[in-house]
């Protein structure tokens, strides 16, 4: 099919420009009508409507045998025009729109060709005589045609000198035009719009996702994109895990483009956002919406003591509170919350041990939140709900025993610990740091005395916050947060057994 596409695009142009030069010149008014701004304006409005508007000229071209020559002259002259437009800010995306459908037709020629450009297809219908007549000699004459084109399109030929690959563009638009689009992508905003408009066809390129993509594009384009614009950082989050999972299906071609876009400044995130909605739907968007109700998170930032508490229960409430509460494993905390030992624990080592129970997962969450601006915590929350559902919901009842959490609320030291410098001095996280090295964690969990030995000096030595900061930076801790293994660690009575040496102290 690609050779036929190239034949339909270029050699017949030569032959027809040779055979019907006056006809094509007389037809230049319809060519102008094709290039008249109304269809281009419709292109600016909606790429799909642009394809629709392309269809009527297609029909009108079906009347004229020189339609193939028209389409070719359109591709050559109008592509030069579009390139000169591409020098302007927004239009290059339109040029890429007009060009990318043929690449789609090249990939899956018949169906998408029928969608995007029947002109090449009809020219293919005309093709057999034309190909038999003009196959190779017209190519040679094609190489001659630039001179003839120079009479008509001398300024575009100057632009041809800028991009000699345009002739090859008409034959293989994707390669040259993609390179051009990448050079456009070097510009700040427009390439992203081009990429946005381009991604729907790539999504349609994906075989089965073609049916999925229309709703996806319709969802992402207007409302969820705006909602995602509210949380751009979530885009950065979705880039790492969800985009990988997402991109497996549609994005092989589009992902490469998105990576080149991602290298660009701001809008690539919006492009990734357009992809994100499916991930949001995968993550059960209603909970994400409930998560997007950041007031509790804002309240986290508002009240430091409440922030310390909100690490576990409010985040739980954000993420369908009971399961995340079970995530935070309040049952062990409840055992901790037996206020007499906790009173004894209220001595800062006890707060450290206390925070150990909720904080390994929740503090890692807060660390990831601290590394990100604010929204990543929501992403981590969205991650936690399934884990929360995995955790026993019965602890929800134990959660309902709010007295332990209330006793936590009594912990102003934990609040002050939430203020990172005292937390660093408590260095709950530094021993957790040693724990978070999962091999050592495994060994530590198996050998609690070894853990105590390691923890006792490290707590003093690790009181230096820098290791905690480095922990905050490592996605490894985030992966630990994801692993149910750490969750199981938090659930383990092992945690309480760990606290016992501190109590002894």
From Swiss-Prot:
Chain spans, region Disordered: 1-474
Polar residues biased stretches: 1-16, 66-78, 165-177, 188-200, 233-254, 265-293, 309-329, 345-365, 373-383, 399-408, 435-448
Biased composition (Low complexity): 17-33, 40-59, 96-122, 129-140, 147-158, 201-226, 453-474
Name under which the protein is recorded: Putative uncharacterized protein ENSP00000383309
Species for this entry: Homo sapiens
